[in-house]
């Protein structure tokens, strides 16, 4: 077992504080509209320029092991806030640094860390309640655009794009961010349900200009196994041909004789037909086939349910207004499924999302939800250089997360003012002893820090003066760091999602509390000999040690 170094008491806390400060100081320069960029060196390719707090935090690794532990604890604040709310990572880092700094002074002066932590936790609970009380819900396109603009570092183009995307696909719709081929940033909306499988043979194409297969008012056969034998497919083909409507076949695979027969009949004009592989794999494929069946009002023909392909009737087939397929994607528009069944399926998927513990599963469930509830919007990011493209893409993703958070829990006044207004909630915080009172006061002081930092980043204003003026005002009155004026911030479009502000405070207090109650830090002893590269062997094999 490797030998360990142990640091106790003030030694441990002092080193942890150095790590906390190094990371927080690098992150907090990005806060607010006047925040600066941070350049991050990459081993390969050009350096990355970012104004995103969590991106900066994730890149920081310190040489001293105890300092690094402090830095990593604060990095956790940024990461957790990003995961939960998608934005507010810099605010969370600033709050964590402030709570730890103020708390450490009191621990060094003899306060009991555990009581400080209890006081901090009680204070945070009251502040969160106050934030919820002053929160207001949003619904209009203009309000959504304001949130997106602020989170994208005051880029109104991005705010407008996100608002337009949400308007078109709904708040449950999937909005994805991709890199464009050109310099223009644009929004593309795919109506209906789209999945990433294209036609099985180019001979199914009906429009040779666009190389797409287009089926109007088709019947849709959904089968969960491979089809290789024409005999089992023939009865349902004959029935659909008699109906005079095109047929789309979705199956695990269609091969051999079955595929060849379909192609020949399509080319002769005997059948209007197209075949496509089912999307997904394993259990996810079964779920997606069921989604398609519910959306189109059909039935998944599955032997597990007791259905056989050769016995299928027209009542088993789904229907849609139109279907278009290219070599990569299939899009179903105007599925004819019962709206009650679709709503029930949507609610079932929402329930699965709430219970899901895996980020990957949650993402896939949200994609399925969006496909059922109205479509997919794609924001294609254009830029002159790759560095600019990556930076802009990160900002759009941040803005998208923040906008979703705003739709969920509403908005509060931005610019650090909501935390100042929420200070009055501390009047309700109960303390059992003097140290808990100090914990409450620590939070009172820390809540001022984001506003101080936003002002400091302007480089032209005094944080203490601005803070006092904001405290004298009421409601939405605050300091707009972009225009360096005092005004009604909500009317000026300076707003933050309540979820972002709440998550930032809760996560900051949680990690700062753990750091304050830390009494020892244990690290591996660094052995310089272990770090040296191995000596190259002397000479070559069979050369008698010659060089």
From Swiss-Prot:
It catalyses: ATP + H2O + a folded polypeptide = ADP + phosphate + an unfolded polypeptide. Residues 538-547 have a biased composition (Gly residues). Pfam families: Cpn60_TCP1 (PF00118). It is found in: Cytoplasm. Transmembrane segments: none annotated. GO terms for biological process: protein refolding. One of its GO terms (molecular function) is unfolded protein binding. The keyword Transmembrane helix does not apply. Its main location: cytoplasm. ATP binds at residues 30-33, 51, 87-91, 415, 496. One of its GO terms (cellular component) is cytoplasm. Its EC number is 5.6.1.7. Keywords: ATP-binding, Chaperone, Cytoplasm, Isomerase, Nucleotide-binding. Residues 528-547 are annotated as: Disordered. It comes from the Bacteria. PANTHER family: 60 KDA HEAT SHOCK PROTEIN, MITOCHONDRIAL (PTHR45633). NCBIfam families: GroEL, PRK00013.1, PRK12849.1, PRK12850.1, PRK12851.1. Forms a cylinder of 14 subunits composed of two heptameric rings stacked back-to-back. Interacts with the co-chaperonin GroES. Belongs to the chaperonin (HSP60) family. Together with its co-chaperonin GroES, plays an essential role in assisting protein folding. The GroEL-GroES system forms a nano-cage that allows encapsulation of the non-native substrate proteins and provides a physical environment optimized to promote and accelerate protein folding. This is Chaperonin GroEL. The gene is groEL.
